[in-house]
Amino acid sequence: QRELLMEVTGLHEIPEGAYNIRANGESVERNSTSNIEIITKEDKSGIEIHIKPGTKRESVHIPVVLSKSGLKEVVYNDFYIGDNADVTIVAGCGIHNGGDAASRHDGIHRFYVGKNAHIKYVEKHYGSGEGKGERIMNPVTEIHLDEDSFMEMDTAQIKGVDSTKRENRAYLKDGAKLVVMERLMTHGSQRAESYFDVQMDGEDSSANIVSRSVAREDSYQLFDSHIHGNNRCSGHTECDAIIMDNAKISATPELSANHVDAALIHEAAIGKIAGEQILKLRTLGLTEE
């Protein structure tokens, strides 16, 4: 479990600040601070994280690890981030499956980001184990950005996840800004599907969704991005994928301009590896070799 924890958070020990560590279906360690309170949901599995207005330079770690084969869970985590807060949230899930039964974690994360708040959200998914049982993760991220708030989402899946369906929805008010960087690598017969649906409802809102991926061997990837400009706004979505071996990749970016001052751009590039693409691979955490 400690190895999984290190892979998804980069931590070798219990973090400072607020944290909730979930292992094999239950919360095993938790700490709240004077500004960040973590409480257990009463009606379903999961937690609520309440961050006081004006909280600065604090972090929340909420990793999940599964090391028992055959475990399946759905967890609901809701984040309430007060006005003018500036915090980092580190999530992620690691599954070690040494058995024959599938292990599955579906994490449903909802963010309610207050006015002028600044959030960095880091999410990493990792799988290991030599068993025949599948390692399945289906994260859902729902983001509500209030006026002039900013959220940066950095999500990565580098290894060992057999099947994933990643759903992301965002709703932006006036002046809100969303930046997403997705990094993905699949191999073997893995399947990865990523869905983004962004509603830019507010005046001068903006969204930038970038996916960098590598598909190897017999794996399959789908990138499906919908950006809706419902006001004066700017939106950009980009899929940049490297295909190798017998892999398959589909990219379906879609733009909907519903306002005369909506400025929307999409870019999609899929191709085999070339010299300049080594740099892209290195952004996935791989070495040049």
Q: For the regions a protein language model found, what residue spans apply to each?
A:
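C-terminal functional modules
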Residues: 1-20
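Conserved beta-strand/loop scaffold segments within soluble protein domains that form the structured core
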Residues: 19-24, 28-286
